[in-house]
Amino acid sequence: MIPDVSHALTWLEAHPKALKGIRRGIERETLRVTADGQLASTGHPESLGAALTHQWITTDFAEALLEFITPVDGDIDHLLTFLRDIHRYTARKLGDERMWPLSMPCFIGAEQDIELAKYGSSNIGRFKTLYREGLKNRYGALMQTISGVHYNFSLPLEFWQAWAGVTDEKSGKEEISAGYFRLIRNYYRFGWVIPYLFGASPAICASFLQGRETALPFERNDKGMCYLPYATSLRLSDLGYTNKSQSNLGITFNDLHTYVAGLKRAIQTPSEEYAALGLKDGDRHLQLNTNVLQIENELYAPIRPKRVTRAGESPSDALLRGGIEYIEVRSLDINPFSPIGVDAVQARFLDLFLIWCVLADAPEMSSDELLCTRKNWNRVILEGRKPGQTIGMGCNDTREPLEKVGKDLFTDLRRVAEVLDGKDSTEYQQVCDELVASFDDPSLTFSARILQAMKEGGIGGVGLELAERYREMLQNEPLELLTEEQLSEEGAASWVRQRELELKDKLSFEEYLALHGGQ
């Protein structure tokens, strides 16, 4: 089941310097809620700066959905402290509001009460809001208020020089991209280990279903909670943030050019379903266009190849220009046991697993096999902790006990951990020891622990209690890396940058839209 990685691990042990200089970044989403857990109806706090142009504090789909973005960092503890500083500063600016500590929202009334994120009057700001209007009309606003954590990861040039024989990023872009696509294919095959260990959405509030049809055999309790007894991450299920209409796009992850061609095809393919929604209601735009994807970012994926874009450049054009620069892992639920939604154990595990995904052999993957991997993920998402659970590989019918596959994987990860730790540390090895125990004892997983708490206190009760505890904790902690002055200066500067964008616009919004894929 697990590919034989022994040769690659032996190579890694002989090249420990190849892993010096791993770079990471984190994006964390969280809903602003009132003291009684209702979605905040206030605008994005002005004191936090302009969501359009702030480097670290922005919004995602909704005006009440905060997103915190760290700079790229070579040190996990430093990275998490930076993220915590942003949380501390924000907690002090939110007045009586709190940050919801769970991926799944709970006390949301009518979908029409969810206000879309606003970014000012510039063309790009209006474009971003219209894109969200399209998402709302296509998939419903409720689904878009589900929050998660994204982990961005890149290996140093020294790794690619030693592993793939490249000299520099420019001349080696094809080889480096091929290495990252190998990582992505292995992620699709084995990444279900992430929701198994860290999924933290085994239950939803009954209100979340709001008349939506579901074939899932939910159990309900007297606290208005629907749950599956062995589920790990309903956020990643069809109930959560996925997109069924995209499953037949045929996008594959075998090489840069076919991947980009698939993406470009999807943003140019008309959709009858979305055409039926209409483009406009009178003068009001309803979506950017009626294609399968309005823009490339609409493609739902548990992992994405990325390159930082230049002004006016699409994500796929950036990839064609420079190859894959880093990958974005998108399968992490909010960690409810951390005030900042993610912790060092998770970050170190992802380092280990993503390195393993690059080292392990990864045969090319057809779009059919990609759909088959979804079945394995679904099994873990909906009943990953079920006693005796088995797991397959791609479209192959043979299955092995999940417990065995997990432990086999950790045998490999332990060797990667020893290389990362070197002689002076045991941090990565400790992560292996802590997490491998979850395969013998599923009650140690995030989903089992949070489900137990939710059965006792209800989802709303648990969410509110944690939100209040973290609010108090973060409000009272001093900043460690940033200063109040730096943060308020960035806030003020972001408003100046937004205003400059608004003054610079020469085109009407209709002209701008026509140039950027609008209809």
From Swiss-Prot:
It catalyses: L-cysteine + L-glutamate + ATP = gamma-L-glutamyl-L-cysteine + ADP + phosphate + H(+). Its EC number is 6.3.2.2. It holds the Pfam family Glu_cys_ligase. One of its GO terms (biological process) is glutathione biosynthetic process. Keywords: ATP-binding, Glutathione biosynthesis, Ligase, Nucleotide-binding. Pathway: Sulfur metabolism; glutathione biosynthesis; glutathione from L-cysteine and L-glutamate: step 1/2. InterPro entries: Gln_synth/guanido_kin_cat_dom (IPR014746), Glu_cys_ligase (IPR007370), Glut_cys_ligase (IPR006334). SUPFAM superfamilies: Glutamine synthetase/guanido kinase. GO terms for molecular function: ATP binding; glutamate-cysteine ligase activity; metal ion binding. It comes from the Bacteria. It is an enzyme of class 6 (ligase). Gene3D superfamilies: 3.30.590.20. GO terms for cellular component: cytosol. Belongs to the glutamate--cysteine ligase type 1 family. Type 1 subfamily. This is Glutamate--cysteine ligase. It comes from Yersinia enterocolitica serotype O:8 / biotype 1B (strain NCTC 13174 / 8081). The gene is gshA.
